[in-house]
Curated annotation (Swiss-Prot):
Pfam families tied to this protein: Desulfoferrodox
Gene that produces this protein: sorA
Annotated protein name in UniProt: Superoxide reductase
Keywords of this entry: Electron transport, Iron, Metal-binding, Oxidoreductase, Transport
Family per record: Belongs to the desulfoferrodoxin family.
Organism: Thermococcus kodakarensis (strain ATCC BAA-918 / JCM 12380 / KOD1)
CDD domains for this protein: SORL_classII (cd03172)
UniProt catalytic activity: reduced [rubredoxin] + superoxide + 2 H(+) = oxidized [rubredoxin] + H2O2
NCBIfam families on file: neela_ferrous
GO MF, one example: iron ion binding
Enzyme class: oxidoreductase
Amino acid sequence: MLSQTIKSGDWKGEKHVPVIEYEKEGDLVKVEVSVGKEIPHPNTPEHHIAWIQLWFHPEDGAFPILVGKVEFSNHTDPLTEPRAVFFFRTQKKGKLYALSYCNIHGLWENEVTLE
């Protein structure tokens, strides 16, 4: 199963774990997802974050909904940063899930509760 290959951890001690930060004003939700907030992640052709996905699973929902995906295509000068900002609207509570993919260390996830 794919779920058995996804790694997680504390983003303060593991540079691959995506960090999820959000602000909510009314029904507008702004979410920033970044990799390497505390410990910078390399961004070279040999070792880089290829993409980040953000998912939202409403409390009453049967399955998560893909909010968006960002691909990072350049790993030379000028360097891209593994960081993305997403906007969506909801009045529901639920879970925000972020996935990131490192070309050497695979899939990483994190989650936060959207109040």
